[in-house]
Amino acid sequence: NNMYLIDYHIHSNNSFDSKETVLSVCKAAIEKGIKEICFTEHFSVKEGIKSYGFLNLKKYSDEIKECREIFKDKLTIRAGIEICEPHENEEELRLILENIPFDFILGSVHNFDYNIGLAAYMSTHSKKESYSRYFEEVNKVCTSPYIDVVAHLDLMKRYAFNTHGNYDFNDYKEKIEEVLKNIIKSGKGIEVNTSTLRGMVNETMPSNDILKMYYDLGGEIITVGSDAHKVEDVGADIKESIEVLKNIGFKNIYKFKNRQAIPVEI
């Protein structure tokens, strides 16, 4: 079994919510038989949210360079970021990003109306309002020129699970279809995020229903990521998720270099 295992959603202590070093993540990846990883550190130009001003680009790029030297034959290391609500500050992002050679950029929705967190929003809104609003926002993210892939497309369920429960795919089918069509039309992709397999939700983000719909609509670009914030989660459920994609009909997953999508046969 020589599957080329890739983990394209990982956080180190270059993100506000992880304590792991780039070095320890790389070691863990090699131990687990992962061949290529991409760090996707939280990044935001929005004041008032936790990731604002946290990423030190000099530290980050120095650590990536150092680890590329150390592990050059054993592991391919890519440098990326995960941008919160990239549709809200396009001009600022443009000025920063046109000078930084990232390999890969994820776009995600963690807040509404600039800085209202998903959980906070949900505490004062119904299940239907919360999920509808979430998919509306994701629909705005997917056309941003500053992202390559939309992260955890149905993330809302992670926050909603305890209080509102998971959503029924059929209730949001039209909206999700619109989102996926926009992603495809704008040349972007989606990811399979395995982090919710490690919690109570017990399915990937997005669900298999969304993955199938993406395939049926002609979607091709898809990455797989653990969303690890701890070394023990690096590479978690990647192999299984690739099998799921294969069974749906996907022929490739994707890796990135200099923000160009590169297919990897599965």
Name each model-derived stretch:
Residues 2-87, 96-99, 159, 164-170, ...:
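An N-terminally biased module of ancient metal coordination in phosphate/nucleic-acid-related enzymes
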Residues 25, 91-93, 207-208:
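Alpha-helical scaffolding within the catalytic cores
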Residues 43, 111, 156, 196, ...:
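Flexible, active-site-proximal loop/turn residues at the rims of small-molecule/cofactor binding pockets
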Residues 40, 108, 153, 193, ...:
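Conserved residues at the C-terminal ends of beta-strands
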Residues 1-12, 22, 163-266:
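Charged catalytic cores and adjacent phosphate/nucleic-acid-binding surfaces used
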Residues 4-7, 36-38, 76-80, 103-106, ...:
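Structural preference for beta-strand elements that scaffold enzyme active sites
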Residues 51-185:
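Extended substrate/RNA-proximal surfaces in nucleic-acid metabolism proteins
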